[in-house]
Amino acid sequence: MTLIHMNILMAFSMSLVGLLMYRSHLMSALLCLEGMMLSLFILAALTILNSHFTLANMMPIILLVFAACEAAIGLALLVMVSNTYGTDYVQSLNLLQC
């Protein structure tokens, strides 16, 4: 395993630990999820470049599309919760149930 792969896996692990530790605020959880998605994107792109597997060239782009959709939905939910309750606590999401 090269140093680049270890750095990317370390970034993914740090984002995962951050998500598990700071899960009380929605904004910090969204930032950690975004860090995880970006490290997965870089890892997928490096793996495809190193293996010369041409059929999987679209996988990093599809991963970026899913990350953009996740970020847009998360930010919309953050704006709605902060406008409604005045805080960005994840506990406020339980109050949105019908």
Swiss-Prot record:
It is an enzyme of class 7 (translocase). Keywords: Electron transport, Membrane, Mitochondrion, Mitochondrion inner membrane, NAD, Respiratory chain, Translocase, Transmembrane, Transmembrane helix, Transport, Ubiquinone. The chain crosses the membrane at residues 1-21, 29-49, 61-81. GO terms for biological process: ATP synthesis coupled electron transport. One of its GO terms (cellular component) is mitochondrial inner membrane. It is a multi-pass membrane protein. It catalyses: a ubiquinone + NADH + 5 H(+)(in) = a ubiquinol + NAD(+) + 4 H(+)(out). Its main location: mitochondrion. It is found in: Mitochondrion inner membrane. Its EC number is 7.1.1.2. GO terms for molecular function: NADH dehydrogenase (ubiquinone) activity. Belongs to the complex I subunit 4L family. Core subunit of the mitochondrial membrane respiratory chain NADH dehydrogenase (Complex I) which catalyzes electron transfer from NADH through the respiratory chain, using ubiquinone as an electron acceptor. Part of the enzyme membrane arm which is embedded in the lipid bilayer and involved in proton translocation. Core subunit of respiratory chain NADH dehydrogenase (Complex I) which is composed of 45 different subunits. This is NADH-ubiquinone oxidoreductase chain 4L. It comes from Balaenoptera omurai. The lineage of its organism: Eukaryota, Metazoa, Chordata, Craniata, Vertebrata. The gene is MT-ND4L.
